[in-house]
Amino acid sequence: MKTIISFFLGCLLACMQLPAQVLEDGFTQSEITDAIFTQIKGKSFKDNCTTPRADLRYLKVLHYNKDGEVLEGEMICHKSIANDLLAIFQELYKAKYPIERMKLVDEYEADDGASMRANNSSAFNFRYISGTKSLSRHSRGMAVDINPLYNPYVRYRGGRTLVEPVNAKPYVDRSKDFPYKIVKGDLCYRLFKKYGFLWGGDWKNSKDYQHFEKY
């Protein structure tokens, strides 16, 4: 009888521990393998890339979309923030915080505009800040864009409003309610701030609601 009871108790404990194991298995980091490097070389990892391959990490995570579906996501970032991002995405996953899409920007030929238009969340991409000759923090894998279509980059110049991506104009008015919107104080904002990231929505001369970066 004791053996039977012990068996069922063991099964019960295993079942209770299963969600944590699944959660742990769904969130991993690794060095950039040859297969991944072949995928990004000449795209996000351009020929003039100054960030060493050894400084980058490939992340695999789980995330929900607004319809409650669980999706597999992937992202490349700098090794110094890999653990931070895994912790952040684990917490977002536990809370069922919606992220529509998370694929390597290379699936869009490293075209930031195309990736944003598809509402693709991403990190590493060796490129310049839009409209400047300065390298973006994305070039080092030290910045992350979350749900970029619904959280656009907005700049006002000479009476004109510049919005990126170009199809994000309906989401410039942050008083409106719509899915995937990041607002100051929400879970996504709080988690990134907890791990020392700065939010583009706090900028004064422009707003980049999708953007979190770390120094």
Question: Across the structure, where does each feature detected by a protein language model lie?
Answer:
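Bacterial Sec-dependent N-terminal signal peptides
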Residues: 1-21
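Second-shell loop/turn segments in exported
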Residues: 70-79, 132, 173-180
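N-terminal module-boundary/linker segments of secreted carbohydrate-active enzymes
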Residues: 21-69
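Mid-length scaffold segments of soluble, non-membrane domains
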Residues: 99-100, 114-148
